[in-house]
Amino acid sequence: MIETLLQSPSSWTNFFIFFGLAVLLLFAVLGFVTYGILAERKVMGFMQGRIGPNQVGGRFGLLQTVADVLKLLLKEDSIPKAADKPLFILAPVIAFAPAFMVLAVIPFTDKFQFADIGVGLLYYIAVSGITTIGVVTGGWASNNKYSLLGGMRAAAQMISYEIPLVMSVIGVVLLAGSLNLNEIVAAQEKVWYIFAQPIGFVIFLIAAVAELNRTPFDLPEAESELVSGYHTEYSGFRWAFFMLSEYVYFFGMSSLITVLFLGGWNPVMFLGFIPGAVWFALKFSSVVFLLIWFRVTFPRIRGDQLMEFGWKILLPIALANIFLTALIKELFF
C-alpha cells in the first residue's frame, strides 16, 4: 500500500493518508514503549528479588507507566532563567524525532514495513546520529555544569562507538551484497549472520549498548556523578521526550539486531508453519531481554575505560573482521 502511495502523484488525499499513517505509527510505538518500559521494570524487579510495579492497574501494575506519563504531562513546564531558551526547547525535539524516523525502514515482516528503501541500513545509521545533536544541545542550553558534562560525555561516547558500530555491519553488507534490510533478511534464509558473523555480532551488540547510553555505558546520565546528566534541568513533558527517545531507540536497535544477525522473520529449521511476525517477535524479545540483563548485571565503567575499550579494542577487531570477511568471501564464495 505504502509503495503504491509513494509512486502515485501528489495530492491532498495522499497527504492525509500519509499523515494518518504517521499518527497511527506514533500511537502504536508510544503504546508499545509504554508497556515495554513496564516489562523492563518487572523483569528488573524479578532479577533483583523485588515485585516491581503492582499498585496501579491491578496486581500486575498494568497502568503504572500510563500513570507515570500522565504525571509527567501534568507537571509544570519550568525553564531555568539562565538557560538558552530557544535551544532548551528545541533540544528534546531534536533528540526525539530521529527515534521515530528510523523505525520507518525496519522490516518487521516481509509484508509489514513503512518504507522499503534501497539503502535502509545507511539511512538508519545516518538518522540515528542526529540524536547526538539534541543531547549536546540540551546539555549546553541548560547552562548547568552537570548537564554540560553529561552532554560532552554523550558526544564523545556516541562518536567513539559509532565507528565500530558501522564497521561491524560492513561484514553483513559484504555477505548480503546489499544495504537493503529486506534483502539482508532474505540472504539469511539458510544461515543467520550471528553464525556467519559472530565477531561482528558481538561488536555490534557492545557498540549498540554504548550508543543507547545504557548500563554499563550510561556515563552521560550517571545519577551518582552528574545528578541526571544532560537532562538534569528538564522536567515534565520535555524530560519525557528524552526518555521516550531513549526507549524508542532501545526497541529500534533491538529490531535492527534482529534483522541484521537473527534472520528477521525467517523461521528456525522445520518450523516454517509459524508466522514470520511471531518469529520476529520472539527474536526481538530475546534481544530486549539480553539488554535488560546487561543493565541489571553490570556496573558502570569509568570514562577512560570506555574510551580505551572503544578505540583500542573494538575498532581494531572490527577492522580485522572486515578484512577476514572480505578474504573469506573472495576465496570461498
Swiss-Prot record:
Keywords: Cell membrane, Membrane, NAD, Quinone, Translocase, Transmembrane, Transmembrane helix, Ubiquinone
Cited InterPro entries: NADH_UbQ_OxRdtase_su1/FPO (IPR001694), NADH_UbQ_OxRdtase_su1_CS (IPR018086)
GO MF: NADH dehydrogenase activity; oxidoreductase activity, acting on NAD(P)H, quinone or similar compound as acceptor; quinone binding
PROSITE patterns: COMPLEX1_ND1_2 (PS00668)
GO biological process: aerobic respiration
Membrane topology: Multi-pass membrane protein
EC number: 7.1.1.-
Transmembrane segments: 15-35, 88-108, 117-137, 159-179, 191-211, 239-259, 272-294, 313-333
GO cellular component: plasma membrane
Name of a matching Pfam family: NADHdh
Main location: membrane
Subcellular location: Cell membrane
Keyword Cell membrane listed: yes
Assigned protein family: Belongs to the complex I subunit 1 family.
PANTHER family: NADH DEHYDROGENASE SUBUNIT 1, NADH-UBIQUINONE OXIDOREDUCTASE CHAIN 1
Subunit record text: NDH-1 is composed of 14 different subunits. Subunits NuoA, H, J, K, L, M, N constitute the membrane sector of the complex.
Annotated function: NDH-1 shuttles electrons from NADH, via FMN and iron-sulfur (Fe-S) centers, to quinones in the respiratory chain. The immediate electron acceptor for the enzyme in this species is believed to be ubiquinone. Couples the redox reaction to proton translocation (for every two electrons transferred, four hydrogen ions are translocated across the cytoplasmic membrane), and thus conserves the redox energy in a proton gradient. This subunit may bind ubiquinone.
Protein name as it appears in the record: NADH-quinone oxidoreductase subunit H
